[in-house]
Amino acid sequence: MISASLQQRKTRTRRSMLFVPGANAAMVSNSFIYPADALMFDLEDSVALREKDTARRMVYHALQHPLYRDIETIVRVNALDSEWGVNDLEAVVRGGADVVRLPKTDTAQDVLDIEKEILRIEKACGREPGSTGLLAAIESPLGITRAVEIAHASERLIGIALGAEDYVRNLRTERSPEGTELLFARCSILQAARSAGIQAFDTVYSDANNEAGFLQEAAHIKQLGFDGKSLINPRQIDLLHNLYAPTQKEVDHARRVVEAAEAAAREGLGVVSLNGKMVDGPVIDRARLVLSRAELSGIREE
């Protein structure tokens, strides 16, 4: 069972999730200034072995700072079977992280194992049981082949995410500007997430200085249907948010669709029509999504 608060948070907008290296004291202290939808403190790959304990303490204190109270906080912990995994979980659950990001998720059992530990810690520290969300990162061919069972493994899951660097290395290839080598993985992640009714998140774009390349990749994953993307540089936030914002033309059309649907409902009509054409449920739902994105992001700047 999950808490009512987590159930409400599962569908919140997460276009951008900004990685914050846990050992970078300046970023851990000041990342609340960035307008990302979620801040993702990292205790795993970006932290050197000798800095693991220090990073954990810094993130623990940051999670409790009042300036982070109104920001969704996600923490990528080290694998549960590593020497740091359990201590990471103790710190971030007790610290009040909204979501724990599980790295290198290969099976549903990986999710169940960390869920069991989180529940134990919630009960021990007096936190509401079921209030800590989970985000499973899939980073291997094995994980991709089991994406559906992973996505359905726990009610705590708010989404699943693609981690491309390890995945591409295991494929014995490298990342390309076109992203051809990631298409199967991206589609697998997306289909699995949607089958479970949760969100899907794309991998990072690591060349922070290549704005055109970032926008090309972001437009591609948005068209596929991803809810958002992990980011490594604050400069990518506004670029991504603008890309997810609808155009004025899209907003105008969506408003007409919703107005037609509301008029039909008031009149007790079973069929919605606009300009002589029938409008079905999925089109109406899409129109409402466009309007909600416009309310959040404004109109796209071309």
Curated annotation (Swiss-Prot):
<protein>
    <recommendedName>
        <fullName>Citrate lyase subunit beta</fullName>
        <ecNumber>4.1.3.6</ecNumber>
        <ecNumber>4.1.3.34</ecNumber>
    </recommendedName>
</protein>
<keyword id="KW-0456">Lyase</keyword>
<dbReference type="GO" id="GO:0009346">
    <property type="term" value="C:ATP-independent citrate lyase complex"/>
</dbReference>
<keyword id="KW-0963">Cytoplasm</keyword>
<dbReference type="GO" id="GO:0006084">
    <property type="term" value="P:acetyl-CoA metabolic process"/>
</dbReference>
<comment type="similarity">
    <text>Belongs to the HpcH/HpaI aldolase family. Citrate lyase beta subunit subfamily.</text>
</comment>
<comment type="function">
    <text>Represents a citryl-ACP lyase.</text>
</comment>
<dbReference type="InterPro" id="IPR015813">
    <property type="entry name" value="Pyrv/PenolPyrv_kinase-like_dom"/>
</dbReference>
<dbReference type="GO" id="GO:0006101">
    <property type="term" value="P:citrate metabolic process"/>
</dbReference>
<feature type="binding site">
    <location>
        <position position="139"/>
    </location>
    <ligand>
        <name>substrate</name>
    </ligand>
</feature>
<dbReference type="GO" id="GO:0005737">
    <property type="term" value="C:cytoplasm"/>
</dbReference>
<keyword id="KW-0479">Metal-binding</keyword>
<dbReference type="GO" id="GO:0008815">
    <property type="term" value="F:citrate (pro-3S)-lyase activity"/>
</dbReference>
<dbReference type="GO" id="GO:0008816">
    <property type="term" value="F:citryl-CoA lyase activity"/>
</dbReference>
<feature type="binding site">
    <location>
        <position position="76"/>
    </location>
    <ligand>
        <name>substrate</name>
    </ligand>
</feature>
<feature type="binding site">
    <location>
        <position position="166"/>
    </location>
    <ligand>
        <name>Mg(2+)</name>
    </ligand>
</feature>
<dbReference type="InterPro" id="IPR005000">
    <property type="entry name" value="Aldolase/citrate-lyase_domain"/>
</dbReference>
<keyword id="KW-0460">Magnesium</keyword>
<dbReference type="GO" id="GO:0006107">
    <property type="term" value="P:oxaloacetate metabolic process"/>
</dbReference>
<dbReference type="InterPro" id="IPR040442">
    <property type="entry name" value="Pyrv_kinase-like_dom_sf"/>
</dbReference>
<dbReference type="InterPro" id="IPR011206">
    <property type="entry name" value="Citrate_lyase_beta/mcl1/mcl2"/>
</dbReference>
<feature type="binding site">
    <location>
        <position position="139"/>
    </location>
    <ligand>
        <name>Mg(2+)</name>
    </ligand>
</feature>
<dbReference type="InterPro" id="IPR006475">
    <property type="entry name" value="Citrate_lyase_beta_bac"/>
</dbReference>
<comment type="subunit">
    <text>Oligomer with a subunit composition of (alpha,beta,gamma)6.</text>
</comment>
<dbReference type="Pfam" id="PF03328">
    <property type="entry name" value="HpcH_HpaI"/>
</dbReference>
<dbReference type="GO" id="GO:0000287">
    <property type="term" value="F:magnesium ion binding"/>
</dbReference>
